[in-house]
């Protein structure tokens, strides 16, 4: 059995920064993470329907790559943003723009009441948490907290996969994920 080390969020951020400084572009890192997550997903017995919860930062960017790759693979995909699309930052914004050229519904969560949010969750077999990554600190707030609570209330009968780290675990209010896909080591 292989031993997989656990890393604190600060160490993971430092490792990511070193990779980027060594010449690996952030967009390439997102692409690698997205492909790794999709490779894992495709090995699971799922109904080919995914709702991707995406934050404004790099974890959301990973989610946009995952959405694009699943859509290219014939999946029904919907992206639910925890923020206004214009607030996506850096490489995440680049990947959201790429995704915008595909027939993938992208919905801002603030536009949904509780009934519409529940209906959206219920219409997908897999929920992918790409809200907050290792850069998050403290308890989730606002729409992010609302989405985490909704997923935890309605997770029965569907699969929940977290990208990088379950969102909100730093603040003790995290997504209850069935699976967590990480790059580099356990966090």
Give the role of each language-model region:
Residues 1-7, 46-53, 58-187:
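Glycine-rich phosphate/dinucleotide-binding loop and adjoining beta-alpha-beta core of small-molecule
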Residues 1-48:
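Positively charged, low-complexity intrinsically disordered leader regions
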């Amino acid at each position: 059995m292989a031993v997989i080390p656990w890393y604190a969020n600060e160490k993971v951020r430092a490792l990511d920064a070193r990779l980027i400084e060594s010449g690996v572009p952030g967009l390439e890192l997102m692409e690698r993470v997205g492909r790794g997550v999709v490779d894992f997903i495709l090995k699971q017995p799922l109904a080919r329907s995914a709702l991707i919860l995406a934050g404004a930062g790099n974890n959301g960017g990973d989610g946009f790559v995952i959405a694009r790759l699943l859509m290219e693979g014939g999946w029904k995909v919907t992206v639910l943003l925890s923020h206004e699309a214009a607030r996506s930052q850096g490489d995440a914004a680049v990947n959201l723009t790429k995704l915008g050229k595909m027939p993938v519904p992208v919905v801002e969560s603030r536009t949904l009441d509780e009934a519409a949010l529940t209906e959206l969750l219920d219409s997908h077999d897999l929920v992918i948490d790409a809200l907050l990554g290792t850069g998050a600190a403290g308890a989730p707030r606002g729409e992010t907290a609302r989405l985490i609570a909704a997923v935890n209330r309605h997770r029965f009968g569907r699969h929940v996969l977290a990208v990088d780290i379950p969102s909100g675990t730093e603040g003790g209010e995290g997504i209850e994920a069935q699976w967590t896909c990480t790059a580099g080591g356990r966090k």
